Amino acid sequence: MKEDAEKSCLWLKREYDSGLIKSWSLDLIQNLPLSGFKEWQDDLKKAITFSPPHLSIYDLNIENGTVFKKLINLGKLKLPSDEEAFSNSESTHLILKNSGYSRYEISNYCLPRHQSRHNRVYWSGLGWWSFGQGSTSSPWGEKFTRPRVSKEYKKWVTRQDEFNLDSSLTNKEFVYKELDEKIMLGLRLKEGVDIKEVFKEQNWENKKFESNFSKLLEEWERFLRSGLLVRKGNRFFLSEPNGMELSNQVLVSMFKWWDEIN
């Protein structure tokens, strides 16, 4: 399988270098069980030799009901500790930075002029279309997922041909995201989010507007002091690499604030 992946990367590099494709991306998963620090570094450096214009680096997410989750519960599989995972992620950032890649979102790196437009649309809270089995679209703010099972997806497509189109294809009334989700999405981007700008959508009276802003600042004060979070005017963004690697701490405090004011 690894050999097939390398052949695919080599083909994509050749097509890109010849100008037949404009860009391509490679997805990698770090902090895997049974994968040590050196093994991951070797894989990452190997990937860089193919010069992919765009790289997405994800951490393994263990879901309930999966084989991995069962093995972990049985003590037969062990994930890296939080300290090991942080060290790995920090090393990943430095290797990619020294190889000419810039980080424009927590999980995404690219060479100049190769930011993913789809990723930027998603993290900016704008709408997008996706097509095919199991795909998720959000053209007007609300997410719609197509059936994941082939049989059910075929039935869904047939209904579109024989009856009226599904409302997810025709409803053009935009559904705005909740404020906490909008802040969370914005903070994932390198440029962060203008808090007072996204506050405006709440139509709060001035006194409530300023009160809620002050309460959020209180929650974030310790992260501003520690350097995980940076403020420039009303714009807040996560520092690199520590803020982005430890973003959950900042986001959890923001969700706590949101629950308290609602």
Predicted regions and their residues:
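Intrinsically disordered or highly flexible coil/loop and linker segments, enriched in small
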Residues: 192-193, 229, 260
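C-terminal scaffold of the Radical SAM
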Residues: 1-210
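An alpha-helix initiation/capping motif
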Residues: 86, 177, 214, 241-244
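A short, conserved structural fragment
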Residues: 224-234
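Short amphipathic alpha-helical interaction segments
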Residues: 206-224
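Short, amphipathic alpha-helical interaction segments positioned at domain boundaries
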Residues: 241-262
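Minor-groove-contacting beta-hairpin "wing" of winged helix-turn-helix DNA-binding domains
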Residues: 235-240
